[in-house]
Amino acid sequence: NGVPYGRYGQPMMMGDMPLWGVSVDDLGYQFDDDQINYEVSAWYGLDERRLSLRSEGSVQTKDEKDIDSLTSLSYWKPLSIFWNGEAGVAYDTKNDKPAIMAGIVGTMPYFIETDARAYLYTDGQVRLDLGAEYEWRLSQHWVVIPEVGLSAFSKDDIDNHITKGFNELETEVRLTYETLGRQLAPYVGVSYETALGSARGQRRQENESVDSSSLTAGVKFWF
């Protein structure tokens, strides 16, 4: 209409303002394995592009207190209404190597949350992580969450107990109680892990168990 914005300038839409967030998707204890598991992510940016920092791993609470973690710094961008893409760099403490990473995260039909991430390490190793979970809401606060994770590698790495192909399957079922506007959710659950393919034979040769189950308890929260 030709009317100037005035001395305060052009108004800024909320979508143009950088925001930030932190999400702790898991901070829990795995009783039979005596370890603390964690999955943390933080982001800063706009609705259409963000910088994302993500770390997941475990800390042994007995013996040598080993720490296994996979940490990535990536550029995040929505690809569609239900899917987001990311690309960046990562570092894996288990094999002590950096990697280039790319992934896609989103919601499949029937509201199944899905993520797929690929890592190319400096030694040429390629790692693929696949994950899925579903929220079965029992009431306003109580939620049952089954989840599954699968990992695969492109070649053998004997030093790090890795074999070519699908290596490990992890599953867990949690009973969660959401409170404080769903920002805080303690849980109890049962987890199960099993080696796959050639990894089963390798573990047997080293007198290690090929599968294990454990009770878990922890909390997830965001702000």
Which residues does each PLM region occupy?
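Outer-membrane beta-barrel initiation region
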Residues: 1-64, 73-77
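Short loop/turn motifs that connect adjacent beta-strands in outer-membrane beta-barrel proteins
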Residues: 12-18, 31-34, 45-50, 79-82, ...
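Residues that define the transmembrane beta-barrel architecture of outer-membrane proteins
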Residues: 18-20, 34-38, 65-71, 96-100, ...
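Transmembrane beta-strand segments that form the barrel wall of outer-membrane beta-barrel proteins
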Residues: 20-30, 49-61, 71-73, 82-93, ...
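Residue-level signature of outer-membrane beta-barrel architecture
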Residues: 44-46, 75-77, 91, 106, ...
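Detector for outer-membrane/organellar transmembrane beta-barrel domains
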Residues: 97-157
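Flexible, surface-exposed loop regions and adjacent strand-edge segments
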Residues: 105, 133, 162-167, 203-210
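Outer-membrane beta-barrel "beta-signal"
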Residues: 173-179, 209-223
